[in-house]
Amino acid sequence: MALAMMIRNAASKRGMTPISGHFGGLRSMSSWWKSVEPAPKDPILGVTEAFLADPSPEKVNVGVGAYRDDNGKPVVLECVREAEKRLAGSTFMEYLPMGGSAKMVDLTLKLAYGDNSEFIKDKRIAAVQTLSGTGACRLFADFQKRFSPGSQIYIPVPTWSNHHNIWKDAQVPQKTYHYYHPETKGLDFSALMDDVKNAPEGSFFLLHACAHNPTGVDPTEEQWREISQLFKAKKHFAFFDMAYQGFASGDPARDAKSIRIFLEDGHHIGISQSYAKNMGLYGQRVGCLSVLCEDPKQAVAVKSQLQQLARPMYSNPPLHGAQLVSTILEDPELKSLWLKEVKVMADRIIGMRTTLRESLEKLGSPLSWEHVTKQIGMFCYSGLTPEQVDRLTSEYHIYMTRNGRISMAGVTTGNVGYLANAIHEVTKSS
C-alpha cells in the first residue's frame, strides 16, 4: 500500500493519471491464495510424522512402507554400496533422454518379461524410465486418458491409497472391483471374478503383480490363470503395478509369475516397475513403464507418445539411480549379490510374521491369527479396526495406518513381543 501511494503521489506531481486497475491489482496480491485450505494429510506419510513427534521411548512405527533391519534401521544394500564405489568420480552429469537410460530400461524389462523374452527380442515393448512406480502409474494414467479418452480404470478394494489420487488427477474415471474378504482375511475370488465378468468389454484393470498392498493377499497360480482367461474372453486390458518384486517370495522371477501367465495367454499388458523396495533406492526414484504392443512399429509410436507426455511433466528422469541399477544388473557378481540380499529381506519379514503370530497365540488370544502367516510381502492386513488402531497409538505409542495395515518390515525381534501384547490388549474383548 505504501508503495502504491508513493507512485500515486509521484504521478500526480507529474500530471499523470495512474491506471486504477493496476493498483487494484497491487492491493489484491496479498489475497490471491486466501481461498487455499490446508490439504489433508497423506494417510501413510502422516503416520511417520506423528511417530517422529512422539517423545515416548517405547514408540513403534509399523506404518512406513520401507524395509528396516532387525534393529529398526534403514538398510543400504551391499550391492548398492559397491555400485556407488564404482560410480564414484564419474564425470558424466548430462541430461538423460526423455525416455531415460536405455540400458537400465532393457535390464529392467528382463526382470518382468524374462531374460529370453521373445517380446524383447522382437522389439514389441514400448518402455521408458520413470520416477519410480508412482511416476510409471501416473504416466500410464495420462497415456490412457489421451489415447482412450472414454475409458475408466477398475481398481481393487482395497489398494494403495495413492492409486486413486493418480488416476483422479489424470482425470480418468474410476470404478472398483472386489478383492479382499474381511471375514476370511483372504481373497474374495468369486466376487473378483464376477466383477471382471460384469465389467464392459475392453475395460482397463489395475492389478497388483505380487505382494498386494495393503492386504498381502495374492491369487494362487491357478487363480491367476483363471483371471487371465476371463480377461481374454472379455478383451480387458491389464495394467500391472509391480512395486514389490522379490518381496513376496524372495525370488524376483517367481514374483513375476502373474505377468508371465498373462503373457503366455497372449495379452497386451502394461507394467509399472520400481526399485524403491527391492533395491532400497527409495529416494532415487527409479522405475520403468512398459507397454506390450502389436509390433515394433506400434511400440515406436507408443514410446514416442510416452516421451511426449513426460516432456512437460518432468522432461527427463534422474541419472544416478538409473546408473546404480544398471551397474548392479549388468554385472553377474553384483546381480547375484542383489538376489541374495532380496531373499534375506524377504526371509526376515517371513520370520517376523511367524514370530508375531506365535506371540499372539501364546498370549491366549481368542482370535485366529492364521492370516498373519498366510499373507505375503511387506504388509499384513491385520483385521484391526480403526478404533483399535487408535488405542494402539494413544495407549501404546504404536503407529500404523487406520486400516490396520502393519508394515512387517518395521517389526523386529526387539519389539515384536511388545507389539503382540498391545494387539492382544486391544483385541481380547472382541
UniProtKB/Swiss-Prot annotation:
Cofactor: pyridoxal 5'-phosphate
One GO term (biological process): biosynthetic process
GO cellular-component term (any): mitochondrial matrix
InterPro entries documented for this protein: Aminotransferase_I/II_large, Asp_trans, NHTrfase_class1_PyrdxlP-BS, PyrdxlP-dep_Trfase, PyrdxlP-dep_Trfase_major, PyrdxlP-dep_Trfase_small
PROSITE patterns found in the cross-reference section: AA_TRANSFER_CLASS_1
Catalytic class of the enzyme: transferase
Localization annotation: Mitochondrion matrix
MF terms in GO: copper ion binding; L-aspartate:2-oxoglutarate aminotransferase activity; pyridoxal phosphate binding
Keyword line: Aminotransferase, Mitochondrion, Pyridoxal phosphate, Transferase, Transit peptide
Coarse class of the protein's main subcellular location: mitochondrion
Signal peptide range: none
Binding, L-aspartate: 65, 160, 213, 405
Presequence positions on this chain: 1-28
Top-level taxon of the source organism: Eukaryota
Pfam families named in the record: Aminotran_1_2
Transferase recorded as keyword: yes
EC nos: 2.6.1.1
SUPFAM superfamilies: PLP-dependent transferases
Record PTM N6-(pyridoxal phosphate)lysine, positions in chain: 277
General function of this protein: Amino acid aminotransferase important for the metabolism of amino acids and Krebs-cycle related organic acids. No activity with D-Asp or D-Ala as amino donors. In plants, it is involved in nitrogen metabolism and in aspects of carbon and energy metabolism.
Other observations noted: In eukaryotes there are cytoplasmic, mitochondrial and chloroplastic isozymes.
Protein family according to the UniProt entry: Belongs to the class-I pyridoxal-phosphate-dependent aminotransferase family.
Protein's name in the database: Aspartate aminotransferase, mitochondrial
